[in-house]
Amino acid sequence: MSYFEHIPAIRYEGPQSDNPLAYRHYDRTKRVLGKTLEEHLRIAVCYWHTFVWPGQDVFGQGALRRPWQQPGEPLERARQKADAAFAFFTKLGTPFYTFHDTDVAPEGANLHEYVENFARMVDYLGEHQQASGVRLLWGTANLFSHPRFAAGAATSPNPDAFAWAATQVCHALDATHRLGGENYVLWGGREGYETLLNTDLAREREQLARFLAMVVEHKHRIGFTGALLIEPKPQEPTKHQYDYDVATVHGLLTQYGLQNEIRVNIEANHATLAGHSFHHEIANAFALGVFGSVDANRGDPQNGWDTDQFPNSVEELTLAFYEILRHGGFTTGGMNFDAKVRRQSVDPEDLFHGHIGAIDVLALALERAAVLVENDRLDALRRRRYAQWDSEFGRKILAGGYSLQSLAADALARGVNPQHASGAQERLENIVNQAIYALR
C-alpha cells in the first residue's frame, strides 16, 4: 500500500471551496501576462525536508515515523522513499522536484559505495521521471552533514575533505545533467568559520574559489547547459559563512572572475537571517545580474534561526514576484519549497496541507504582482524620480564627459541649487496595497 494512497489528487476547486485537500487559488492553466500559473511559478518540492527529515530538533529525537525511515536494507529503503516522493509529486501536481545526493541514496561506508549507490538511485529516479513527467529543477550535494565536513568542505584545512567533496559534486552534477536538471546548486553550509582564532580567511577564500572554478570547468566539460547557483546564507551552522548574502556572493564571484558563470538561489529565510528583506535580496540579485532561482519559505521573526516554515504572506511574496515579473520572470529557475512541516505534524495529510496552502499563496501573490506590472504605476513614479539623469547633462556625467574638476567648475559657473523632491513612499505603499487587497 502506498503511503499516500488514501489521499486524492489535489485539484483546483476555486475560492469558495472548503475542501482542505484542494487548491482554492492555484489554477495551473490560468493565464497571467501571457503564461499559465504553472509556467510562471515553476514549483518544486524538495526531497530533504519532505522525505528525509525525521522530525528531530536540538532538544529531541525524530518524531516522524515514515516507513522508509525505519530500519532496513538501505537501498530498498531509498527506493521506497523515491516511490513515496513521486506519488506525492504527482498527487500534488507540481512539475519539479529538488534533491541532495544523500537524500536519494545511502552514503555507504566509503567513496566507492557512495558512487555505486548514487548511480543506482539515479537510474531509479530517471525511471520515475519518465513515468510521471515530473522534472528535476536542480540537484546538489550534501557537503555539511557528515563529521568529515565539520570544518568545511571546500574551505576545510584537510585537502582530503576537499577531495571527497569534489567527488560528491562531480557525481551530483553528472546526475543532475543526466536527469535533465535545469540548475545545479552549491550551498556552503560549513564554508565559513566558528572562530577567527584558528581561521586563515584569505586561504579559505582561495580554496573556495578554486573549488568553484573546478565545478565551472566540469559543467562545461560534460556539456551541462543549466545554471550553476550559489545559495547565500549568513550563518548557521557556522558563525559566519562566506556566502553571507547576494552582495557578498557577487563580490566573491567578481574577485575570482566567476561572475558570468554562477548566479544565486535566494532563500527567503536566509535573507531575513542576513538582516535583509526577501524583496531586497531578489532586487539586488537582478541589479547585479546574478538572479537565478528561489527557495520559498519563511522564518519566525521571534527566532534567530532557520525555521524553514511554509510561506504564508501574500504581501511579502507580491513584492518578490513584482521584481521577478518586471525582469521577465524565471528562466531556468523556479519556486522550490525549502520548507518543512512542524515536528508535531506527523500525519501524511500534513505534508499536503503545508504545500497546498503555500502554493495558493504563491498563486495569489503572483496575480497581484501582475497587476502592479500591468498598471505600471510603480515604475512610472520610479522613472519620474530619475528623469533628470536622462537629460543631456545627466547622460554626459555618466558617459564620462566630465572630470571631477570640470564638473565642479560647471556647478560653480551655473550656480546649481538642487531642490529635493518627494520620494512619495506613502503613495507607493498605497499602490501596492490597492493591488493586493482590491476586490475581485
Swiss-Prot record:
Residue numbers binding Mg(2+) 1: 231, 267, 295, 338
SUPFAM superfamilies xrefs: Xylose isomerase-like
Name of the protein this chain belongs to: Xylose isomerase
Subcellular location: Cytoplasm
Cofactor remark: Binds 2 magnesium ions per subunit.
Class in the EC hierarchy, top level: isomerase
EC number, as in UniProt: 5.3.1.5
Subunit annotation: Homotetramer.
Required cofactor(s): Mg(2+)
Keywords noted in UniProt: Carbohydrate metabolism, Cytoplasm, Isomerase, Magnesium, Metal-binding, Xylose metabolism
InterPro entries found in the cross-reference section: Xyl_isomerase-like_sf, Xylose_isom_bac, Xylose_isomerase
Main location group: cytoplasm
Entry annotation: catalytic residues: 100, 103
Keyword Secreted tagged: no
Example of a GO MF term: xylose isomerase activity
Biological processes, Gene Ontology terms: D-xylose metabolic process
Disulfides per UniProt: none
GO cellular component: cytoplasm
Domain of life of the source: Bacteria
UniProt binding sites for Mg(2+) 2: 267, 270, 306, 308
Family in the record: Belongs to the xylose isomerase family.
